[in-house]
Amino acid sequence: KRNFSATLGEGWNRYSNDHFGRVTWVKKPVDDFMPNHEYYNNNAKKTDYNAYLKATYEFVKGLSAFADLQYRYVNVRMVGPADATSAKRSFSYDLNETFNFFNPKFGLNYELSPLHRLYASYAIAHREPVRNNYEHNMDAELEKPRAERLNDLEVGYEFTAKNFTAGLNLYHMNYKDQLVPTGEV
């Protein structure tokens, strides 16, 4: 008996918010740093749409393949003065970036017995830069941050008993334009 199952779906999110910094307290107030002084204020909007198809096909009992296919559209808009303390210098956002991602994942599962399973998968995933990546790269000498791309290969073994589960997962992750916490490319 061969089994096939599939799920199709989509999602849409829109975020809109003002980002601001306000002086809450200073020991010795000066002109630009009086309590309640707003030292930056900008608006950011993010639209995130995705559509996906997940499918599984069982070739023979215990051996199945799967495919997850995702399309993702992301638009980021930021306008206005930025947090100079975080960015280490004063600047204003004038940003309108659009990203189109295709994120596929393919794999095999082989159930040797009810207790033992082997699996392997390959995936490509993308991630857009976040606010801090832009803030830390808004120097004229630095490149604007690019979307991150990850190629991920995994193989593993899983043992599942009534009251105990153990597994071994080996993976290789290869990044291009990795976005690290400092915002560096």
Residue ranges and their predicted role:
Residues T47-L53, F102-F106, L118, N151-V155:
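Hydrophobic, lipid-facing positions within transmembrane beta-strands of outer-membrane proteins
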Residues E111, R117-A125, R146-V185:
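Membrane-embedded beta-barrel scaffold of Gram-negative outer-membrane proteins
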Residues K1-D83, E111, G167:
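Face-selective signature of the C-terminal outer-membrane beta-barrel domain
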Residues W12-D18, Y71-N75, Y122-E128, N137, ...:
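Transmembrane beta-strands of outer-membrane beta-barrel pores
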Residues K1, Y39-T47, F59, R77, ...:
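Short sequence motifs at beta-strands and strand-loop junctions characteristic
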Residues K1, D32-N42, A84-L95, H136-K144, ...:
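Extracellular loop and loop/strand-boundary signature of outer-membrane beta-barrel proteins
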